[in-house]
Amino acid sequence: MTNNTLYQVAKLGKPHSLRGFQYINIDNFFRRFDLSNISMQVGNEELIVENFKTHLKDRNLIKFKDFDTIESIERLRDKVVSISDKYKNDFLNDSKLPWPGFFINKNLGKSDLVLLGFNFSQNFTFCEVSNLTDFPIPYNDKFFSYQNNQLILIN
């Protein structure tokens, strides 16, 4: 991951079972995807996800390869998890848009508008855009498009 930019997407929680799973508090955007076999940066280590699954209504569990005991995963507890921008095109929402976190503080297409942030509310993602801060913009294909690795605000 050395040539790619890393983005914080989660924080690891306590161990869940004897089989190496632990809770992960991950950004809502990623909760519905199968993250198995991708690499993630955990603290200073690059780890491969062996299994990622939903637990109960709004919780997720993760298991990293070669982490099979409570002792081994306990040392990962409370560590920040980051994902590389090399996965930008691999995880797209129903509107074919990537995770908006990849575009924070970047221009939206060729405009002077900049994505300042985003938040998740009741199954919807809303974006805050410079010069339009009074109106959160829904993150969907009616307002945004994704072309040539650029996020574009549709006028």
For the regions a protein language model found, what residue spans apply to each?
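Short Lys/Arg-rich amphipathic alpha-helical segments
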Residues: 1-155
